[in-house]
Amino acid sequence: MDFREFLRQGFVVLDGATGSNLQQAGMESGDCPEQWIAEHPEVFIDLQCRYIEAGSDVLYTPTFTCNRIKLDEYGLASKQEELTKTLVGLTKEAIRRSKADRKIYVAGDVSMTGQQLEPIGSMPFEELVDVYKQQVRLLAKEGVDLFAIETMMSLQECRAALLAVKETCDIPALVTLTYQEDGRTLYGTSPETALVVLQSMGADAIGINCSTGPDKMVDAVKAMAKYACVPLVVKPNAGLPFLQDGVTCYDMDAESFSEAMMPLVDVGATVLGGCCGTTPEHIQKLVSRLKEKKAREIPVSYTHLTLPTTPY
């Protein structure tokens, strides 16, 4: 089934965290995640196999910052194509090994470059679009089913990434931003503003990930639901982080996380997963609770204006 059609069939379950689980497995904070995963493939494949077993319908490729700007910080910009091929291949290998009796969709993960756009920074908008186009082309070449543009702090950067997808291919795209405690992005954008802009640009699903736990996302999802003609996405952290014996932990176990996700379903979220601190157990508990819920019906989007006519 085409992913756009699948999106409107009911709940879609995403995977959970990658980075926090790999840190538990030995990845250091200063490592290039893409290179570390390429050098430790079995750790990553095992994690994604466990997400499939837990009930995830969509796996994110470990290409979060596999763009030429971020890779250049590690002296790896020349290896972007090689790394992309390897990393998408690991997700496909996890699907193959799982022998799942359902289709598992591969999401090409795209995120921030770390560069500031003009006029705050020095990067022209058109150059950022070009950076994302390069990453999008490489992911599309490897056969991803959709793009996950995620953990974005700037609506302008979201626009650049989504434009890159739209001008390169006809592959679906989910877009999620992070919001602060005041309910706005770092640059002051409200959830409903982001929804309206990205929806008008053709994003296939829009929402929130990272930054907070599920209990802090309800108001934002409720605000977006008033204007949404696309599915709404939530991928929260497992609550708040804290240090224990020098290790970052999160305060929501699988049971409390899945319980806190249900109010998000009640206000309209239908595409659900986990971000920092979540594990396959968190996803498994979420899937169990979703069996008791009915997904919000997605309103039909009107692409033209129809005016009443009066006979003369």
What are these regions (language model features)?
Residues M1-L305:
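Domain-level signal for soluble alpha/beta catalytic cores
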Residues H304-Y312:
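Single conserved hydrophobic/aromatic residue that forms the stacking wall/gate
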